[in-house]
Design a protein with these regions (language model features):
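Select subsegments of transmembrane alpha-helices in polytopic membrane proteins
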Residues: 8-15, 80-90, 132-137, 197-207, ...
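Structural signal for membrane-spanning alpha-helices in multi-pass inner-membrane proteins
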Residues: 20-27, 95-103, 119-123, 144-152, ...
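Small-residue-rich segments of transmembrane alpha-helices in multi-pass membrane proteins
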Residues: 17-23, 75-76, 135-150, 191-196, ...
């Protein structure tokens, strides 16, 4: 694979574009067809921003990647570290410029800008700062839905998806930090500061709040859409509770997987309900 393409991790970029389309459908439902141009622009921009973020990540992790990921473009010598850094700047800048000059809704640009600033802060310090880094990852995971909602001029329905993704991701990141505690001696993670038990209780509390929040969205739907949402979100929450169960039983890897699966099913519940409105 071309090293410039590999740096962007194209799989992640494509998944981001899919999330944008999903968020737009959650917000607009069948009327999404009226916003084809805006959604296309947002997908291209989002892919560039994610690609730039991944290139920046590879630049910052270039020393550890010599051992952990020697086949990546920088440690393999396919591209220099300086070139990768410049490439990340070009992608991040271009992704923002596209939004600024092509979309009338400046709030889409604002969300993207905040996301880029959060990404840069994460890669240059917050990653090693524990809970602040967890919050940053949570924001970036949820912001794509607000971004998509703004693109179709109806962010309201995506606020719930943002909240769910934000809280569930923070919980998942804390559980991941618990799992990685032995190898994260150089990071000031929440488990390293307050211990595993307290950290796990906080992660569970945040996830329970996310589960409760998911049911507050039912007033957005009625009829078949309401039935579809309740059914889908209940399945999602069963997976979330399974994640809590596995975390309590010290199976942190499976717990993270359960939470991620629950987030995916929750998104499908919103999509299905939006299509039935």
């Amino acid at each position: 694979m071309n090293p410039y393409i590999a740096l962007t991790r194209p799989g992640n970029a494509i998944l981001t574009a899919i999330a944008v389309i999903a968020g737009a459908f959650i917000a607009a439902g069948p009327e999404i067809i009226e916003f084809q141009t805006e959604i296309a622009i947002c997908c291209v921009s989002a892919m560039m921003l994610v690609g730039g973020g991944n290139a920046l990540n590879d630049y910052n992790d270039r020393e550890s990647d010599k051992e952990n990921h020697p086949n990546r473009p920088i440690p393999s010598g396919e591209i220099s570290a300086e070139t990768a850094l410049n490439y990340s700047h070009i992608l991040l800048g271009s992704g923002l410029v596209i939004l600024w000059f092509t979309l009338a809704n400046w709030l889409v640009f604002l969300i993207a800008l905040i996301g880029v600033l959060t990404l840069i802060a994460y890669e240059n310090g917050l990653k090693a700062a524990g809970i602040a880094g967890n919050i940053a990852v949570g924001f970036m995971s949820g912001a794509v839905f607000l971004y998509a909602g703004m693109a179709v001029d109806n962010p309201g329905p995506t606020i719930w998806m943002f909240g769910l993704a934000f809280l569930a991701t923070i919980s998942r990141e804390i559980i991941k930090d618990i799992q990685d505690l032995e190898g994260d001696r150089d990071r000031k993670t929440l488990p390293s500061r307050i211990g595993i038990d307290y950290s796990l209780n906080i992660a569970i509390m945040i996830l329970v709040i996310a589960i409760g929040l998911s049911y507050t969205a039912i007033n957005q739907f009625e009829g078949n859409a309401l039935s579809a949402y309740i059914g889908g979100i209940t399945i999602a929450n069963v997976l979330m509770f399974l994640g809590i169960y596995n975390a309590k039983n010290k199976d942190f890897f499976t717990s993270q997987k359960n939470i991620k699966q629950g987030m995916g099913v929750a998104m499908l519940a919103f999509i299905l309900a939006a299509g039935l409105i």
